[in-house]
Amino acid sequence: MARNCSVRRPVSPPVPETPRRYVQSGQPEGVPALELTGERTLPDVPEENYWFRRHLAVYEWIAARVDGMRVADLACGEGYGSDVLADRAAEVVGIDANPEAHDHAKARYVRPNLRFERDLVENVAGPFDAIVFLQTIEHIEDVPALLGAIATAAPLAFISTPNRLTLAPEGAEKSDNPWHLREYTIAEYRAVLEPAFGSVEIHGLFHAGKLAVHARAIGLGWDRIHSLLRITKPFYDRFTPAISASDFVLRPAGEADLDEALDFVAVCRE
């Protein structure tokens, strides 16, 4: 979570001998629930709602830009993002290598213009009109090779990653997320993307709405206050599930300092 401006995961009671498992609730009949592992975000897990809405906001922003297109959603995970894209795109193919995520997505998100394939993202092959590849480049070992494959498969790609400066502890090379091989600053992100594409336009994701108010409260000492009042868990147990995608906003580089962004969202063209 971004330091100084982030919503914390709710503080839990003393850790029991067996760590708590977070599993999706309320799944439709016949749809296997997924367990939260940290590799991907999930809907229907109240404690995960901040991260889910943070990802959902970007999918909604991209969906408005792929009207009528044939789209591949690489590393689609649970499938919710592919479903959002299918609201506007002519056809969406959600691709993920994880068998549990693939089975879940195929069972839960059913519509004529949406299908799911189980495969490695490195095997992407077009032609597509656009490729969506969100919050996964930091998991990839051979990034240049994958970006080359994406650039070959589609003339347009939306690629996002967290900002290391607001995710990792100050001065650290990366956060403690064990799935991340490398995290990027804005300069590092540009440097890895630009050789693969003709043009790269990067937007930053920032807090808005309730989260912007929360960030200001943190700056005024809210962390100390809720701790002193012993209301940390009750407050965040209510606040975190109330977060929505509208509590995030995307801004282009010319309108915001991307060093302060939560995530970078690159629009890459051939």
Residue ranges and their predicted role:
Residues 2-126, 130, 134, 144-147, ...:
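Conserved N-terminal segment of class I S-adenosyl-L-methionine
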Residues 198-209:
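Conserved S-adenosyl-L-methionine
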Residues 213-246:
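C-terminal helical/coil "lid" or tail adjacent to the Rossmann-like core of SAM-dependent
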